[in-house]
Amino acid sequence: MGEDRGQGLTRPLFDRLAFQSTVVTPALFLAPMAGVTHSAFRRLLGDFGGHGAVFTEMVSASAFLKENADLSPFTKRRPIEGPVVIQFRMSDEDRVEAVIEKAAALAPLAIDLNLGCPAPKIQQQASGAALWRDFARLASVLRRIRSVYAGPLSVKVRLGDPTEDWRTPFLERLKLFEDAGVDVLTVHPRFSDEKLKRRARWELFPWIADQTRLPVLGNGDVTRPEDVSGHTEAFAPLAGLMLGRAAAVRPWLFRAFAGLPPVAIDHAEVWDRLWGYTLEDFPPERALRRMQEFTVYFAQNFTFGHQLYKAVQVARDVHDLRRIALAFLEAGPQLRRN
């Protein structure tokens, strides 16, 4: 048994943000994370609360048209999750209009376009960072989205390519977003080729916010409220905050940012609860992989967490995985100070 040891706040760091006529309170968002922010994890996050809205995993536009959106773990929803933003990766070769019309029928909080994913496989399909790079195709995709959808539209970006003049194409795209009717901009301040070990450039948030009339959400490397309160000059111009990897490590993390009281945490119970949720939403073989991915993050709560995540990677099936994980978690492993 442990506890939520975040210092917490007396009020949310970011009180509210309007997505057109819908106000999200607080303006704290779960980031889209491949393999993690599926329906089962979003349900677990909802159990703890503190967030304002959640993003789905990055959904393939072409695959989405073949899925039953009410059953797919990418897009199925439960009330406890709160407002949900559906994030897509797409190119101008996709059936953009059909994808957006199908997504709009689900009545999400917003539809989001991923323009930052640097994975080679994604870029080879002319989406993610590759779509950001191709101005004409990006403009075409945004125009086609808006031709069939008037609801809240957001985009998630990085800084672009690491050239000396990176600010010029960045500003050109900010202007494009405004002209195309984008409502909210999320910025992860790393360049397209940078891995996550490179520190996010929080110091760029004020400049970015000053260059656009769009509300800006900040994303990248924030793990505790003190990161924000200790860098007010960087975060004060933002309209909201997006948390990713840190929330996968500690699904209760949003409570501290929202000013909610800390709660006692039984790490074994939390892991086991997600195991059950995941089996409800995925077939066993896919649930195994999803829980292995989650455990890589969750193991970071412990001083010797590497023993946990290495052990679960060789599990034969979901039941073997559960046996291995609970043997570690129920033994009272030493907590690491996050």
Regions picked out by a protein language model, each given a short descriptive name:
Residues 47, 97-125, 136-214:
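Alpha/beta enzyme core
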Residues 33-35, 59-61, 89-91, 116-118, ...:
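Active-site beta-loop-alpha junctions enriched in small/polar residues
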Residues 73, 126-132, 195, 258-260:
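Short glycine-enriched, charge-decorated loop/helix-capping segments at active-site entrances
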